[in-house]
């Protein structure tokens, strides 16, 4: 039987050192052991503007309630 770990999260658009935008996932409670000390960034397509990245992060915050990790 699989072991499922879950946590609430939120997303924020940030600009990386290379100038490209990413959406960063922040965990609320650090209850997912695999992600407790990790940073999870979602790479965006080249040419994504700051406004597009911000709107995407806002949309994700409106629709995503958490993260599930399924460990076999």
Regions found by a protein language model. Give the residues of each.
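Short N-terminal "domain-start" leader segments
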Residues: 1-33
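A short, charged, amphipathic alpha-helix used as a generic interaction element across diverse proteins
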Residues: 36-71
């Amino acid at each position: 039987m699989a072991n499922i770990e879950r946590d609430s999260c939120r997303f924020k658009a940030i600009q990386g050192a290379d100038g490209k935008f990413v959406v960063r996932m922040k965990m609320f409670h650090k209850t997912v052991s695999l992600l407790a000390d990790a940073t999870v960034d979602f790479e965006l397509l080249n040419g994504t503007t700051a406004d597009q990245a911000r709107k995407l992060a806002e949309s994700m915050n409106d629709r995503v309630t958490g993260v599930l990790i399924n460990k076999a």
